[in-house]
Amino acid sequence: MTKQKVAILGPGSWGTALSQVLNDNGHDVRLWGNIPDQIEEINTKHTNRHYFKDIVLDKNITATLDLGQALSDVDAVLFVVPTKVTRLVARQVAAILDHKVVVMHASKGLEPETHERLSTILEEVIPAHFRSEVVVVSGPSHAEETIVRDITLITAASKDIEAAKYVQSLFSNHYFRLYTNTDVIGVETAGALKNIIAVGAGALHGLGYGDNAKAAVITRGLAEITRLGVKLGADPLTYSGLSGVGDLIVTGTSVHSRNWRAGAALGRGEKLEDIERNMGMVIEGIATTKVAYEIAQDLGVYMPITTAIYKSIYEGADIKESILGMMSNEFRSENEWH
């Protein structure tokens, strides 16, 4: 692939790690953010120490506070901003774009107010003549590992397979590999909903339960994620892939996962507001729990783990009682789809 110009919107941990992947591939990378000290640090010290204390970025990776400068003459735009501000940033992009670009996003969540997937928001806000079909970049990927060039395999999903193949070529190299998929609904719901299950797995750890319990919540969590996704129109096979079970494993078992760490802290009895303040990063699984619970209620989808986490976070239920309460649910077949 010839050298491409790519704007990455959001210099958080994942946006920064992906900027290094693209830079390693010889592309022109521009990070955009709205925190002056962070942007100055990236440009002058070539570090982003809030997320990576010991990593020095290539000097060719530049950052800017000026969205127009970031978008000028780019071939592709990657959104890696928190779910709750995706629509706002997309509106700002739409007001500036003056040429057609490949639009990608690598965030994992559902918009709280509308319950919409992020690709749907981008499609609604950015005019079709200024963008490709949206490409979702998702899968099992800790930024802390990608930034040190550890082997990572993820998915590029789009309704337009050619757009997905473009993104596959854009990112893939000797340590970072993408597989294509056309099931956007499946990939996005898997990426968003697995954060809820990671909170649950972390809570079990914080409560002192062992591997048997964690394996159970991850496996049964995958079942309820799949049930909801299929109800929304996803292909069930997607949940067996990188963006499904792969992402669930990496997020539901690792201390790198902020959702797992948040769940562990909840299990230890810490208050949510203290957890969020101490972590200093967005915990997408908290907001997604509420959205998923509401969707499941509307559609009549059985999601006991999501319900238990929801009641603990939003109704003040004791998290241990909520989780143990699932052990007395009515007996079911492992393969029930409702």
Swiss-Prot record:
Key words of the record: Cytoplasm, Lipid biosynthesis, Lipid metabolism, NAD, NADP, Nucleotide-binding, Oxidoreductase, Phospholipid biosynthesis, Phospholipid metabolism
Subcellular location: Cytoplasm
One GO term describing the cellular component: cytosol
Keyword Lipid metabolism (UniProt): yes
Protein name, per record: Glycerol-3-phosphate dehydrogenase [NAD(P)+]
Active-site positions on this chain: K194
Annotated gene: gpsA
Function: Catalyzes the reduction of the glycolytic intermediate dihydroxyacetone phosphate (DHAP) to sn-glycerol 3-phosphate (G3P), the key precursor for phospholipid synthesis.
Domain of life according to the entry: Bacteria
PANTHER family recorded: GLYCEROL-3-PHOSPHATE DEHYDROGENASE, GLYCEROL-3-PHOSPHATE DEHYDROGENASE [NAD(+)] 2, CHLOROPLASTIC
Residues reported in the UniProt entry to bind NADPH: S13, W14, K108, A143, R258, V282, E284
Record organism: Streptococcus pyogenes serotype M6 (strain ATCC BAA-946 / MGAS10394)
Pathway: Membrane lipid metabolism; glycerophospholipid metabolism
